[in-house]
Amino acid sequence: MRVLYLLFSFLFIFLMPLPGVFGGISDPVTCLKSGAICHPVFCPRRYKQIGTCGLPGTKCCKKP
């Protein structure tokens, strides 16, 4: 029975979604923690928008 609890906990940890991947980024701290930059108006060339930085018109941009 204890093996089932251990198996369940490992499955829960490995199948848990990663933060910042499935949820939208909406503040500068989360943006910077994900390795991205905050940029006004639009993302620079070769960057992809992955969220916003909290202020209107400010985008969270990351290199793919």
UniProtKB/Swiss-Prot annotation:
Residues 33-48 are annotated as: Phosphatidylinositol 4,5-bisphosphate (PIP2) binding. Exhibits antimicrobial activity against Gram-negative bacteria and Gram-positive bacteria, with highest activity against Gram-negative bacteria. Antimicrobial activity against P.aruginosa seems to be salt-sensitive and is reduced with high salt concentrations greater than 25 mM. Also exhibits antimicrobial activity against the yeast C.albicans. Permeabilizes C.albicans cell membranes via targeting plasma membrane lipid phosphatidylinositol 4,5-bisphosphate (PIP2), thereby leading to cell fragmentation and cell death. Acts as a ligand for C-C chemokine receptor CCR6. Disulfide bonds join C31-C60, C38-C53, C43-C61. One of its GO terms (cellular component) is extracellular space. This is Defensin beta 4A. Monomer. Homodimer. One of its GO terms (biological process) is antimicrobial humoral immune response mediated by antimicrobial peptide. Keywords: Antibiotic, Antimicrobial, Defensin, Disulfide bond, Secreted, Signal. It is found in: Secreted. One of its GO terms (molecular function) is phosphatidylinositol-4,5-bisphosphate binding. Residues 1-23 form the signal peptide. Coiled coil: none annotated. It comes from the Eukaryota. Belongs to the beta-defensin family. LAP/TAP subfamily. Its main location: secreted. Gene3D superfamilies: Antimicrobial Peptide, Beta-defensin 2, Chain A.
